[in-house]
Amino acid sequence: MIVYVDPDLPGITRKKVCNGWGYWTAKGVRITDRDEIDRLNKIALPPAYVDAWFCPSPHGHIQAIGYDAKGRRQYRYHLDFRAKQEAEKFDRLAHFGRALPLLRAQVERNIAGRPTDRDTVIAAVVRLLDEGRIRVGNEAYATENKSFGATTLRNRHATVKGSKLSLQYRAKSGVMRKLTVTDRGLLRVVRKVQDLPGQNLFQYLNDDGTACPATSTNVNAYIKEAMGEDFSAKHFRTWSASVIALEHIVAACRTGGKVKLADLLEPVAEALGNTPTVARKSYVHPLVLGLKDAGFDAKTLPRRTRWLSPAERALIALLDETSEEVAKAAA
């Protein structure tokens, strides 16, 4: 059973000793129980992390915290907690897909507004999340790590040439990303906001004419309001990964070819700027991965609607069908 813990409360600390690590309770008593020492060692908090904190309970959702060389707080979560988080993320994917037309329709309305208006700029950021599959960004990461996302992109990262927006920037973990977007509405906004003072790419003018950068808080609030549920920018990448993988499976099934896992994950990893391993573990829905061997009847692919592609509609149907089967089995 997982217990939610407060990492700001006193916990277990560690010190280097001759044969590895020694651990001390919050009261300063050295831990000698072999099973407890083994538990703490298995957490595998990197030796270079300083000011280490370990959860006194083996059931805490956070098992350890440390600070890396750049002073960033790093967490080690309980494996069961991580599994629960991943399961919840995938469980809500069908709900996200069904609500996506509401968001896309709202973005279409707002992105046609005055290019420097708040809602227009926020809509442009959401369009970039949808089309470019990039992270939303966080100003703290941009300042401390020099890694960027949609809301923290600088003008120097963007080049508009003709009908193309080219982005080149350093993403999470220092990965250099290059992508090209051709969406007309997005380009129209970018051309205008690049003329505003300041380094940030996505800025809007407030009531007194001051340029204000779009933030992840703005974007997530916009998404939640439009979709009517507690969704956020992070859901786009999970959704896109599963759709791209399903599209690859459909294409292979149409030609009668066999789907290899590496070939399936490569386009997903490229689109998200991750490794194939990360794409498999954290982004592509397990049910879609299962189709690699089970196959998919491409003839049953739904028609495109205004706001959803055939693969997106097929993914929703697949997830709904599986949920119904699970519900029947549990009844």
Q: How would you label these PLM feature ranges?
A:
Residues 1-148, 154-261, 265-272, 277-281, ...:
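A positively charged, amphipathic N-terminal helix/segment that binds anionic biomolecules
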Residues 168-172, 180-182, 292-305:
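Short Lys/Arg-enriched helix C-cap and helix-to-coil transition segments
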Residues 263-268, 274, 284-303:
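C-terminal structured "cap/appendage" subdomains that terminate the fold
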Residues 288-295, 302-331:
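Short, amphipathic C-terminal "tail helix"
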